[in-house]
Amino acid sequence: MKKFCQKLVGNKELIKINYYIAPLNKKTHPEQYLEQQKFFNELKKIKKFNIILGRLEKRKRDGEIYYVEKASDVDLALDLALDAQKEIYDEAYLISNYGDFSGATNAVKDFKKEIIYVAIGNRKVVSHYLKNVASRTFYITKNFISDCKLKT
């Protein structure tokens, strides 16, 4: 993950990496929960890496139970804007295709900071909202990913 982020920023200083996610439910998904915790433990070993936890809320529709991730998007948007206000960074890299981050992206630009939208996936899933408001867009390619893989 750090190699991916460092390749993304190039020769610029990497201030911090924030990863926003909701932990899985230990009772309903015990095996996946353990795997996720192992993954988190590996990520915690990376210098400057922060895991910001949201939550999963249980929902039911037509007799089917499903979970919705909550708070991660709000936490990310707040951190983008508040860190820009606090002069913590000059450039932020937003790795998400969630168009609702366009408001936070505009807020960052109001503080005279650059925000780079990092688009992953094919052009059909790219957020045109983010693309239109970001300072610039960087497309992740297969070659970029291949260069970041660990060499064994």
Predicted regions and their residues:
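Nuclease catalytic cores that cleave nucleic-acid phosphodiester bonds
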Residues: K44-T152
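Domain-level signal for Mg2+-assisted phosphodiester chemistry and nucleotide/NA-binding surfaces
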Residues: M1-V68, E114, G121
